[in-house]
Amino acid sequence: MSAELFLTDHSLELVKQGFDAGIHLGHLQDPALITETFANHSVVLCASTDYLKKFGHPKNIAELESHRLIKISSMEFHQPRQLDDYFANLGVQKGFHLTVNDTDMAYHSAIMGAGIAPLPNYLVMPQFERGRLSRVLPDIDTDAHPVQLVLPANRHLSSKTVSFKNFLASYFRR
């Protein structure tokens, strides 16, 4: 069996574009699709250990504005996303050293020491364990959002789709 993986931060029309399945972060309301939630994710502030050695740890939200912040902004989305509004929801209006339109770019920028970024916990946990990233202001929590397998409704599941579904279930049980 082989698989083709297509990664994007853009919204897709799963059925129209002929995909067998998708992974969606957040709540999805589409009657043409069925969803199965495998996990929840939240957003955490993090920075590289090198950045924190050089610039120090902010002690509160107000101190964030004097740090180098990595802002994620995705103008193509029709509704606000958890990452886009992260700093605004905290009341932080300045300190943006870098604005990117891609979560992976923010992730790699944070690892390279460019600043403090709001990133999904599932993405940064391995880097916390390796000591490459550290949490900043760990008392700040965000609402959890589901990680969902998305499938076209009224379509028979192929063996490869069932295998993919089983793989996801196993992966997220860890």
Where would I find each of the regions flagged by the language model?
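Central regulatory/effector-binding core of bacterial HTH transcription factors
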Residues: 1-34
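C-terminal regulatory
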Residues: 12, 28-144, 174
